[in-house]
Amino acid sequence: MENILCFLNSYTETGLSPDSHCLDIDLNFICLSGLGLFILYLFYMVLTLYSSPTEKNNDTQKHQGRARRKRKSVTFKDRKSLQKEAEEERKLHSFLKSFGPPVSCSPLGQHHDTTLFRRLLCPDPVCRVCNRATADIQRLLSWESLKDAAPSVSPLASSASGAESSFTLASTPSATTPEDLILSSRPKPSPPPPLILSPDLITTLADLFSPSPLRDPLPPQPVSPLDSKFPIDHSPPQQLPFPLLPPHHIERVEPSLQPEASLSLNTIFSFGSTLCQDISQAVNRTDSCARHHGPPTPSALPPEDCTVTQSKSNLTVLKTFPEMLSLGGSGGSSTSAPTTKGIDHSCPASSEFSWWQPHAKDSFSSNFVPSDFMEELLTLHSSEASLGGHSVANIIQPVNISFLSHDIPALLERQVKRRGDFLMWKENGKKPGSFPTQLRPNYQLNSSRNMLTSTAVKHDLAESFPFWASKGKLEWQHIHQQPPYSKCFEDHLEQKYVQLFWGLPSLHSESLHPTVFVQHGRSSMFVFFNGITNTSMSHESPVLPPPQPLFLPSTQPLPLPQTLPRGQSLHLTQVKSLAQPQSPFPALPPSPLFLIRVCGVCFHRPQNEARSLMPSEINHLEWNVLQKVQESVWGLPSVVQKSQEDFCPPAPNPVLVRKSFKVHVPISIIPGDFPLSSEVRKKLEQHIRKRLIQRRWGLPRRIHESLSLLRPQNKISELSVSESIHGPLNISLVEGQRCNVLKKSASSFPRSFHERSSNMLSMENVGNYQGCSQETAPKNHLLHDPETSSEEDLRSNSERDLGTHMMHLSGNDSGVRLGQKQLENALTVHLSKKFEEINEGRMPGTVHSSWHSVKQTICLPEKSHSQIKHRNLAALVSEDHRVDTSQEMSFLSSNKQKMLEAHIKSFHMKPILNLSI
């Protein structure tokens, strides 16, 4: 060990020494070894790429082989188990057949009596375990009978159970369990033992094995065991005393039944009908039953057969429509659905059905159950024959059904409603308007929302009456009507259906047109799902009036029908009471209602009502419209509107006019032309002009305010005009403006006003010269007309007055006092003139100029009286009005000047503000 360590130490020392060549040799070796490793890695990658697909294929083949082996083993085991189960079922079936041979009308749809087996299991009719076992046995028996009858379908496909048979519907596990379908009956006090009735009293077996539609929006609802618990009375069966129908009325059905179908809801009657529906009856010693068709399926699916069983007697009687009218019995309704294919469309005549009518009337009693459910069991289905065009109505009439409990009709009614809901869901899956060729317009449904039937109407006049009843409650009603059109006469086979939106998950329901027939004397009334119409019972098309033109609707609306209280279901008795006064619905008039449809709004109006407005009403409307237009265009004040109402009476009430027929025809007024007299027109124009003046220049109250500030007792104190605003003014400018003011005032005012102003000035004057000067001025004004006076006279008068006034001021102190008084009087007269001018309605063209002249007159220069006298004399002698000197007014104090200045400023700003507003 020590030698090895020494060798390693010596080797490392020699390798690490700088003079040794071992390091160079090791580097070359390292490079070569790395290159070799890289090449090996490349070879490995290439091999993996080529080998991976083959390995994957091998793995998949291995997995597939394992799966096949597993499937083979499972299928082999399943086959064995299925064979064992089939053998057990056959044994059980043969064992159950030994209890009692079935009474069948045809190999298809046999019903076996399991009552004895049920009694052997347990005497207690309420035992759920025994009921479940009985339901399973019944399902097995039904399935076996269907499998045996599938290869060869008999033309007569109907079956019935014995006198004491219990009816049980076989259901699939996906919908409901057999336990929920078994219902027991209460024991009858009579000696015969009680019967056990399954939850579905009468339900078609084709619904059990029919494939679910492709567009079912909702799955079928499970049936609760509490919805169909009822006993049925025990009585011996009756035999139909009439033979079978002719063989050419037998329907041909293709045997295509699928067992993997979901459970359909309960039904009472399923009556298949196309253009003409044929029924095959089978006679048996103990009982008989009628074969019916199941609910409608999409056109791609094959037809289905339904089997109706009963315990007492036949529940259906086929009668023609006219013969049913002659009986006068109470009506009802049932579910009707057409088959899709394989139907013999040869229609029998009405006479072929009449030979067995007496037998039918004798074999069945007329004791109907007086309940709403029995009224719902009768339907009317009217159809046209494809050959010959004869109309034959097939009616299913329930007879002699009696129950021990009064709750049985309500339970059966719930069964009918659930079945109708399922049929409605199946119809909602289809696209609107996609009717198959065999699906005629005579399609009807019986559901919780509509207990109505359909009838082929040969014209397109239909008054609709939609109903929306959820869970047997009528929520709202509305009258709807379709207007007649002439196009329906050309092709009466095409029916226009009213679309009804149900709010279900699908887009909307199929175009439904169900009706219910109400017999009233010789006439009949068809209550549509979406309408009500009165038609005659003759086979000929009724004569319809031509389309009426559309007019304006009446102002009086038609009262809507009253809403029924909640919990009250719509039945045939309520439909019959539509024509009676005491019914909750309004009585329909004998004449058809004409309809105006504007944007989805329906207006109902009787035929005899006025279809257009009267000329007087049109004039009233025009008058009101023109009045509104005038008010909007002119914007007249309330005074003008009041005067207009005095001369133009308002339009009378159209309702009163219609009653009295005495119409006051108003005058048609063109906008801008008022029917006023000349005097009223002048007054109106003057009033409007005054209002315009007031709006433009201010209201008269402003002038009153200015006059109140310039009263004679305090005018001198308020005549303080500051020179800071306009500066000193020359006398010539003042004199010129004064002359212009006097000239304009003399030319625009009447003679009386000038006399009054001159009298005011003459009373204030003192002195002979002054009095003469004041007298000459009014004389000149009186001699000359204000409108024809010349400018020279006015100017001379004004200059003379002003000159005498100035000369008087230069005399002495008394002259100064008199001059001040004259100035005050002149200002007062001027303002009064302007005030009267505005009150008289004249255009105030001189308002601004007069105000400016007054301001200039007041703003006399306050100089010495000698200078004023000298200037006035120089102006009078040389007639040179251009004097550059100025003088302040010494007779006004500073306080008075400030007050006058503030007043002038405010008075000057008010018109400007009014104009800007």
UniProtKB/Swiss-Prot annotation:
Q: Where in the cell is it found?
A: Membrane
Compositionally biased tracts (Basic residues): 63-74
Q: Name one GO biological process term.
A: spermatogenesis
Q: Which residues cross the membrane?
A: 29-49
Q: Where is the composition biased (Polar residues)?
A: 164-177
Gene Ontology CC annotation, any one:
membrane
Q: Which domain of life does this protein belong to?
A: Eukaryota
Q: What is its main location?
A: membrane
| Bias (Low complexity) | 152-163
**Keyword set, alphabetical order:** Differentiation, Membrane, Spermatogenesis, Transmembrane, Transmembrane helix
| Entry keyword S-adenosyl-L-methionine | no
Stated role: May play a role in spermatogenesis.
Similarity field: Belongs to the SPATA31 family.
Q: What is this protein called?
A: Spermatogenesis-associated protein 31D3
- State the organism named in the record: Homo sapiens
What gene makes this protein?
A: SPATA31D3
